[in-house]
């Protein structure tokens, strides 16, 4: 169930360079946790690092759903001092059910919050992917002079950035993202493996009706056994109340 998908931990870009792979500079090293087997997560940030036998870094990436709109996923990679470079590399490899327009061989430099990506001409969809992915890092405000607002045409009306598809989640489920819907409202429905509703409600983003706003909400739920499930987000048509702009995020629900 990969119809389309969508969610972010404080990480910063570190200095680096390279001629055959993306390079990053003018940024401090990424933060790490200090307790073995404990993963640190925080709403509103973009990367998670875990200290264990082998350290890893969780990146927030953006690919293209079948309808050509952006979808957010998370991916664990080996711990690195250049997470921005790792992000560009990972953007060339789309998960099943999605596509990417980001070419390989890109170079990255960062100066005072401005990221500059060179090495190949970025088509509009690729630029949108790169802008959204790199601006999850708090040290990056724009890419090649473009902000998220400049590439918003590639974002769906409701973009869930957390949780990611196929995440194993427990109650309460924390959901974050951004939206541009009529009067800033939309609905959600959390379903179990049988499609039975576990929770449903409406959400109000910080802005809407032509302006993209952010949202964050929590869903308490209860299941007896681990099972597949799904989070559905959608808007009700102002004309006839029908479901429009629906996105489905497959999840693994655990007690």
Predicted regions and their residues:
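Bimodal "functional hotspot" detector
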Residues: 2-12, 17-255
């Amino acid at each position: 169930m990969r119809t389309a998908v969508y969610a972010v931990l404080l990480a910063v870009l570190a200095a680096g360079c390279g001629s055959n792979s993306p390079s990053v500079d003018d940024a401090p090293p990424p933060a790490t946790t200090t307790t073995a087997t404990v993963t640190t997560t925080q709403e509103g940030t973009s990367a998670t690092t875990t200290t264990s036998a082998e350290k890893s870094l969780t990146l927030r990436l953006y690919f293209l759903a079948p309808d050509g709109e952006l979808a957010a996923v998370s991916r664990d990679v080996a711990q690195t001092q250049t997470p921005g470079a790792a992000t560009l590399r990972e953007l060339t490899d789309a998960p099943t059910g999605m596509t990417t327009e980001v070419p390989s061989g890109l170079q990255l430099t960062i100066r005072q919050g401005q990221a500059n990506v060179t090495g190949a001409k970025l088509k509009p969809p690729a630029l949108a992917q790169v802008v959204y992915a790199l601006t999850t890092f708090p040290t990056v405000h724009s890419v090649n002079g473009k902000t998220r607002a400049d590439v918003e045409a590639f974002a769906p009306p409701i973009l869930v950035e957390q949780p990611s598809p196929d995440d194993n989640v427990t109650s309460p489920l924390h959901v974050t993202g951004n939206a541009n819907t009529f009067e800033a409202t939309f609905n959600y429905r959390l379903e179990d493996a049988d499609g039975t509703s576990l929770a449903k409600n409406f959400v109000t983003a910080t802005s809407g009706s032509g302006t993209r706003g952010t949202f964050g909400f929590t869903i308490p739920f209860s299941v007896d056994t681990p099972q597949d499930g799904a989070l559905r987000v959608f808007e009700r048509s102002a004309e006839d109340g029908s479901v429009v702009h629906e996105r489905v995020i497959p999840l693994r629900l655990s007690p």
